[in-house]
């Protein structure tokens, strides 16, 4: 550990020295900038933009741009960034994390890299933990950016898509992390490019970066959609396929695929009262019929699945065991439930999902600032490729951080906490009490009420009220109880006469499992060189001590217990033992987050393929023939390959021709005699020629290339979206089940990767087959809705 610390200190010192030289250059421009009148200073923005267009880089103009933004901040905000803030700004511009203590002006520091990067014209996102902070910072700092000729937007959950688009099109956009995530997912579900709101993700600067990238890293953002109407569709499809006779469908047992014959198609059109089963409007119906066919004629009860207590359970074909928690994908499970007349489990379906880890790793450049990141430096480096640099404080820290006090019981600990609060309150010194849980803050509040000590309780519920309470927490005689995260982002300024009383006293009622959260609480006191004090009160009955308290501490306390219930140990040993317990918990939490990321990376790779495909389709402005016809060709290749494995005279021509009739052309356009005597390659070429002719006929039927393009978009998007949402569900089921089973001696992650890859390839095959069938067999109509 000592070596790691030494490395950090040395690398920080090197980095600060390097950036210090640049800061000197910015400082050297101070007088030159002061000489410029307002118009000339504002004109610098246009000059910088032109220089960037002429080939200069952001790094080339950094020194001048920082000097301009610094002088503008003085004129507009009445604030002049210190030298340490210039260094912090450069760390952020470099795509790294600036660790700046509370009160060191993070918000002002951010204006420098935000201004510089906004000059590139690709958009800068300033990300905050709540909408109140986004509103506050955008209106306060927005004055500066607007004065310098840049546009500023704020993105919130109440906005319409048009308002969001306007906010994202600004040079600088303030938003919460969750709103950016949901907008990204929604953008990848739209069917018209005009409905998208975001531009490509360029540069994000995250405030309270540890909270978003570490504490919330495992939180998935999920968009769900209800799917109740499809329950009846499963039942109707099931009733229909149960009426079929042998000649109405063909089964290919090798690939376990099944399709309707021309006869079966006619029966379906009568049953469902539709003119053309393969019309685009019937894509959902087709999907349900396909699954009902598989459920009834391919899947066998007590071999592929069992029915137990009204539930369909999968049987593992290798072990013969029931696979708890797994469901067949792509709607097959629901089709079997309809077949067996048990309840169809088809509630909310996940339409799209992503974790913050993968969302923010998609930005071209990512940076962040916080008062506490050093303890998580390894995680930031390994997962986000961001280095943490600790920025020196503008003035030396004058806070008195006292050693922990340890009591035998919770009761004796809280007795001591209340006594300390009372003593400080009588003196008039403001007190901020930090609790780990909401119930602790309420319990302590009741104790203070009993003592008649006026106080305010702050639970992170009302952000606007929260800021007001935090602002007043530094006034004479104030007693504020707050849970961990409450009030981050708002400074506690000391009221008149408080410095003389010793500044803000911070009391921690227990140690959090993360050192970072404890450091955040301490850091509320002693801002900008103010005096202050911090003290943690612990007991042997605290969660952390019960889980990780070492034997040495327990021995000490067993001796204490005999002496006095209210006895206290004040010792560096306690603090060291607690810290080592915290490090163990942090290590466990990091491993858990890393594990989540490894699983999520499988989904990320798949998501990127599907979203890129959708983007290509949505953005296309002339023709999708180059996307669509290769899908048709690959589908033909797969079908022909599967049925020409044997010698030529044993080719399964009947199935190949049946495929051509149901997915490519009409009955009269192909007969078995047409492909007799052909090699596999000749059959493929012949079918591809038929498909090309079919495409040309569709072009002729419509005349208008715009309508053909629209038709192509409708077909591809409907099929892709249907299969992708089913696939997300299936991957979710797979993930839960590999965790449950642990696959004996096998690595669950490897199993998830391999099985997930197989399922994804299967989905792509299904998408291409269904797109082929829908496009080739549909009649193109005008005014189609995507």
Swiss-Prot record:
Membrane topology listed for this record:
Peripheral membrane protein
UniProt key word Membrane: yes
Which UniProt keywords are present, listed alphabetically?
Answer: ATP-binding, Cell membrane, Cytoplasm, Membrane, Nucleotide-binding, Protein transport, Translocase, Translocation, Transport
One of this protein's GO BP terms? protein transport by the Sec complex
Gene Ontology terms for molecular function? ATP binding; protein-exporting ATPase activity
Which E.C. number(s) belong to this protein? 7.4.2.8
According to UniProt, the name of this protein is Protein translocase subunit SecA 1
The species this protein was found in? Pediococcus pentosaceus (strain ATCC 25745 / CCUG 21536 / LMG 10740 / 183-1w)
